[in-house]
């Protein structure tokens, strides 16, 4: 497939570009800044510029079979709040609607479990129930989570209007190597550090594999899919964590051992995807 990857210079974007090239796809990479030279070997073409520019967005999607939209500020602290929201939402709107108009058949919208509204909330909300499913209501108050929630609405709208298959992948904390080790060390020192993220995680390389799988699976319409590792970041059992940090949350299904409190069935069934990287049995590298 001919695939546009937006935000190609980001932490996930770089992994996605390399993964797609390894899987035989032809990659056009976009970012608002110059990309590292190390990405050149994986790309057929590079587009540099701001996706909020409608003409640039139209140019970026032209001739593509699929779009992977990973461009976004990655947290509410990455810029001023107004800039985080307007950049993330407008860039999603520009590139996804341009893809729809251009007849692009497959859209992978890189979303986040922040679209639930838990991860960055200052009021420390708890999920209504676990395992948290994709239809859990939005409970957020931060601009980043709101921007990802709205981005999923944009993807669904584009799918309905132009008939494209659009998949919003909800990722948790992503990391590998030193980034993952640092995150784990903070959680192990104090499990409350990851309370808002419900101790979910995924190796960045597995996230890229999930994106690649999404491009070729037989899907239709728009669907949001949670993609996480099967276990948590914590050393304490999941039920103990929930009782300590989310005592009002209803536990609707068994969560033995360190099982992640997110429903992952949709990802396994629709994407035929299972993470291969783990931190409990191997060194986090």
Where are these regions (language model features)?
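N-terminal Rossmann NAD(P)H-binding glycine-rich loop of SDR-like oxidoreductase domains
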Residues: 3-23
């Amino acid at each position: 497939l001919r695939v546009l990857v937006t935000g190609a210079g980001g932490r996930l974007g770089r992994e996605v570009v390399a993964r797609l090239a390894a899987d035989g796809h032809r990659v056009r990479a976009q970012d608002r800044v110059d990309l590292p030279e190390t990405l050149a070997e994986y790309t057929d073409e590079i587009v540099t510029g701001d996706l909020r520019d409608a003409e640039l967005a139209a140019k970026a999607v032209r001739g593509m079979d699929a779009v992977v939209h990973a461009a976004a500020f990655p947290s509410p602290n990455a810029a001023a709040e107004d800039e985080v929201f307007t950049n993330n939402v407008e860039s999603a709107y520009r590139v996804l609607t341009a893809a729809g108009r251009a007849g692009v058949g497959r859209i992978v919208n890189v979303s986040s479990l922040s679209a639930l509204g838990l991860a960055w909330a200052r009021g420390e909300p708890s999920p209504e129930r676990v395992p948290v499913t994709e239809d859990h209501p939005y409970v957020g108050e931060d601009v980043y989570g709101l921007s990802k929630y709205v981005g999923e609405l944009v993807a669904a709208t584009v799918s309905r209007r132009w008939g494209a298959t659009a998949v919003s992948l909800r990722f948790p904390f992503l990391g590998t190597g030193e980034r993952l080790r640092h995150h784990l060390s903070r959680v192990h020192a104090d499990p409350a550090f990851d309370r808002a993220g419900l101790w979910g995680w995924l190796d960045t390389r597995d996230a890229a594999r999930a994106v690649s799988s999404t491009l070729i699976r037989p899907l239709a319409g728009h669907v949001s899919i949670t993609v996480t590792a099967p276990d948590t970041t914590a050393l304490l059992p999941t039920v103990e964590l929930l009782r300590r940090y989310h005592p009002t949350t209803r536990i609707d299904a068994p969560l033995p051992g360190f099982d992640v409190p997110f429903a992952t069935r949709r990802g396994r069934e629709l994407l035929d995807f299972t993470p291969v990287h783990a931190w409990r049995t191997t060194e986090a590298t």
